[in-house]
């Protein structure tokens, strides 16, 4: 049974079911198309299209979780992608280089994600995608990357993460238990998730905020506020992987920068219920996607 590696924030709280037990015991649905956006074997995405292709569909650019590690891939996102496309939303689920893959971390993973996001315009030349309604969304570590995409127009031009001015606008950003602020994650989690005696955030970013401040200024969504788009932060009340105070703390900082950010805490849901379309939590989450995708 696969689960994201961590030491639970709530060590005395027993999850009501083993993470991923239901969705990983089944073969995920197949996407309509698997399309490379780069030359590396990890630079591809799965495209899910609504059955009615007569009109252009809003599109969710989705980033999977797994603490940016190569042990975890996009396969499990097939379940939510299939559900969203059945409700009229296209999904471009992105794979990217993760820790353990050559060139991953800072800046490689960020550049992969930026290139895959901009590749949506290429997809729209062939498939009926509404480029004025592109939503970035992600689960866990993927939530960090999704919100980073929404804020990268603020990246300093001298940064390694600076790319030509983004040509594709973000309509809204949705975090599913995302680590949307790396500084807050390190502080609130008290370094509860480690690799080689240091927080995994530091592995991914190339050091701590004190060691590589420029990396965090360019790669942390909290440093890129205001994002300038509606932001939706969704988390299960029983989540034992992501700091429970993170969504509210992030939203408060966003509001202070005059951004629009809402927090939805779902009673009884854990870290994985919110990406499982068979869970009780999912109808609430689907409704947020549907509302966010409207013009």
Kindly give the residue locations of the regions a language model identified.
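Catalytic histidine-centered segment of alpha/beta-hydrolase-like enzymes
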Residues: 269-279
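Conserved alpha/beta-hydrolase "acid-adjacent" motif
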Residues: 240-249
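Short, surface-exposed "cap/lid" segments of acyl-processing enzymes
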Residues: 52-55, 60-83
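N-terminal cap/lid segment of alpha/beta-hydrolase-fold proteins
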Residues: 4-55
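Short beta-strand/loop motif that positions the catalytic acidic residue
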Residues: 227, 233-235, 239
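Catalytic nucleophile-loop/oxyanion-hole region of alpha/beta-hydrolase
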Residues: 72-81, 92-133
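Primarily recognizes the serine-hydrolase "nucleophile elbow" in alpha/beta-hydrolase
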Residues: 118-188
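Mobile cap/lid helix-loop segments that gate and shape the active-site cleft of serine hydrolases
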Residues: 24, 30, 40, 184-223
């Amino acid at each position: 049974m696969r689960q994201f590696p961590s030491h639970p924030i709530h060590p005395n709280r027993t999850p009501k079911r083993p993470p991923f037990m239901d969705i990983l015991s089944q073969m995920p649905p197949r996407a309509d198309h698997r399309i490379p956006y780069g030359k590396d074997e990890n630079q591809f995405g799965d495209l899910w299209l609504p059955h009615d292709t007569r009109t252009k569909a809003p599109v969710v650019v989705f980033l999977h979780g797994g603490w940016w590690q190569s042990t975890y891939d996009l396969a499990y996102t097939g379940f939510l992608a299939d559900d969203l496309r059945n409700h009229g939303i296209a999904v471009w689920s992105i794979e990217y280089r993760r820790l353990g893959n050559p060139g991953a971390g800072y800046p490689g993973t960020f550049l992969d994600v930026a290139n895959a996001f901009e590749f949506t315009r290429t997809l729209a030349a062939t498939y009926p995608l509404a480029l004025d309604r592109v939503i970035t969304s992600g689960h866990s570590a993927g939530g960090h990357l999704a919100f980073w995409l929404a804020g990268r127009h603020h990246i300093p031009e001298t940064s390694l993460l600076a790319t030509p001015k983004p040509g594709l606008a973000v309509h809204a950003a949705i975090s599913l238990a995302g680590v949307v602020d790396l500084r807050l994650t390190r502080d609130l989690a008290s370094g509860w998730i480690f690799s080689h005696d240091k927080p995994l955030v530091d592995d991914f970013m190339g050091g701590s905020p004190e060691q590589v401040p420029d990396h965090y200024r360019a790669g942390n969504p909290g440093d890129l506020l205001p994002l300038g788009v509606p932001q939706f932060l969704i988390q299960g009340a029983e989540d034992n992987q992501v700091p429970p105070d993170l969504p509210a703390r992030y939203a408060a900082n966003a509001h202070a920068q005059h951004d629009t950010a809402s927090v939805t805490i779902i009673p009884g849901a854990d870290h994985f219920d919110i990406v499982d379309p068979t869970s009780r939590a999912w109808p609430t989450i689907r409704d947020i996607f549907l509302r966010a995708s409207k013009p």
